[in-house]
Amino acid sequence: MKHRVEMPQLEQMENELKRVKYKRRYRSVLRSTIYALITVAAVAVLVATLWMPVLQIYGASMTPTLEAGDIILSLKTGVFRAGDIIAFYYNNKILVKRVIAGPGEWVNIDEEGSVYGNDVLQNEPYISQKALGECDIYLPYQVPDQRYFVMGDHRETSVDSRSTAVGCVAHEYIVGRIAFRVWPLNAFGKVE
């Protein structure tokens, strides 16, 4: 007894060819999509590491400007001026404070908490209440070379350059200038 093998019809062959081509095209598109996603993720990590670190705010030393839980972007720049908000390394943490004075400049704070930079009263609309806070340095104070005098916006509770525990921030410890808030969405935008 012989087995008879039926030859597939032309229509069946065309359908099988379409199925195989579709499967190959699907695999190709899937592979390309995965490669594109991996590339985008790698570029995002590289950008976040080298140029725009993403940080989260912990604590209340920068209220009302920045609140605990805010997620911010910093820019790695080399120039910082009075009024800029910077992130810097301190005791294996990253702190966020506002620059009050740069290298060689003089800082003075009176009993009411008014801040003077080079004997000029600083206009500080971003603070809610003036306070001398914890201060164990001798005033007026001259900022050393390659360092920045920083203070938190919530002056009463912030531990910053007014304390010898923190002191002035060395330029090499600065992560970058805070430029943009990305979270919460209702406060999304540039940070001043």
What are these regions (language model features)?
Residues 2-30, 50, 56, 64-70, ...:
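Soluble "head" domains of membrane/secretory-pathway proteins
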